[in-house]
Amino acid sequence: VMYTAGSLAMAYGYDYEKAMIAGLLHDCAKCLPTEKKISLCEKNDILVSKVERENPGLLHAKAGMVLAEEAYGVKDPQILHAIKVHTTGEPDMNTLDKIIYIADYIEPLRCEAPHLSIIRQIAFSDLNQCMAEILYDTLHYLSGRKGSVDPTTQLTYQFYEPYGKDQPWKH
């Protein structure tokens, strides 16, 4: 993800060092036990929603933001925010937020996401369209699974949906 984020940053004229730091640390809390993730969030007054308690894998982003600051000394608010929103997204994300969200989805080791080759191409031409296509695929994937979808992801899709294009898989 780090190198993909750096490549996207260069393509869009963004600070590639910031992007690479965020890409490197975006999953820094992923392997923590669920209770530790919850504890990190609660100690730092970060809301843990019912959906996050039901799907604790989502919590690594919020906990990762805290860990990046406390354990790795990251102070840049844009880097910390990009780590925080890289799983659910949020409406009207800034450039770094979108770069990390997208890099996490298109990184070279990912191979099972639907429409990945097309989405990888879009990533280097239009961040907003790429967000729309990733969120569309993500919500369709999650709708076929047991469990609830984070409302923030739904709101994020509603924000980016107008940027999406009519793709063959949407029919």
Please name every model-derived segment.
Residues 6, 11-133:
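Divalent metal-dependent catalytic cores for phosphoryl transfer on phosphate-bearing substrates
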Residues 140-171:
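Charged phosphate-binding loop/patch that engages nucleotide di/tri-phosphates or the phosphate backbone
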